A protein has these predicted regions:
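Metalloprotease/metallohydrolase-associated module, dominated by Zn2+-dependent proteases
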Residues: 9-27, 33-91, 132-160
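Generic preference for well-ordered secondary structure
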Residues: 28, 41-42, 101, 106, ...
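Glycine-rich, often proline-containing surface loops adjacent to acidic residues and nearby aromatics
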Residues: 93-96, 118
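Active-site recognition of the HExxH zinc-binding catalytic motif
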Residues: 111-123
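Surface-exposed, polar/charged faces of alpha-helical domains
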Residues: 127-131
Length: 160
């Protein structure tokens, strides 16, 4: 009888672990399932043609296209020297895009949305995947000319 009870406890433990693993593995799908993109944000996301996984990640962050005051409230921790048009808040797993309506900057909302989604995707990587990606990115970055636009703009950001 004792052996049956031990096996039953093990089975219950195994089922609980399986459920937790499933919930963790599909957390983005659960968060994204009921989120509906509306208005301009829907058009922006449609125009950038994300993969299925990228679309799920984006929707899981419940992205918001915000006007100036709301955006500044959501993204209050940026430097005054850097123009911030989007913000992925890792602590909240939320994505915010400043609603730039300027004919002088065509596509800026699309580029910003895709860029911030990449921050969210990076946040979801396992530590060993981040280490590999960081290494690859550093190798490419180190090959850039010293006066490249990317190097110049990266100097505005804090080292991580």
């Amino acid at each position: 009888m004792k052996q049956k009870r031990g096996f039953g406890s093990f089975l219950i433990w195994l089922v609980i672990v399986a459920i937790l693993f499933f919930a963790y593995s599909y957390r983005d799908e659960f968060k994204a399932r009921d989120f509906i993109l509306t208005g301009d944000l829907s058009e922006i996301v449609s125009s950038i043609k994300l993969t299925g996984r990228a679309d799920t990640i984006l929707r899981a962050t419940h992205p918001e296209l915000q006007q100036k005051d709301a955006f500044n409230e959501s993204c209050h921790s940026h430097s005054q020297e850097v123009y911030v048009l989007g913000w992925y808040r890792e602590d909240q797993d939320r994505l915010y895009v400043y609603n730039v309506n300027s004919k002088d900057l065509p596509g800026v909302r699309e580029v910003t949305t895709a860029h911030e989604m990449l921050h969210a995707a990076y946040h979801r990587l396992y530590f060993w995947e981040k280490a590999d990606l960081d290494k690859e990115l550093k190798q490419v970055y180190d090959q850039l000319p010293q006066d490249s636009e990317l190097r110049t703009s990266m100097q505005s950001y804090p080292a991580s």
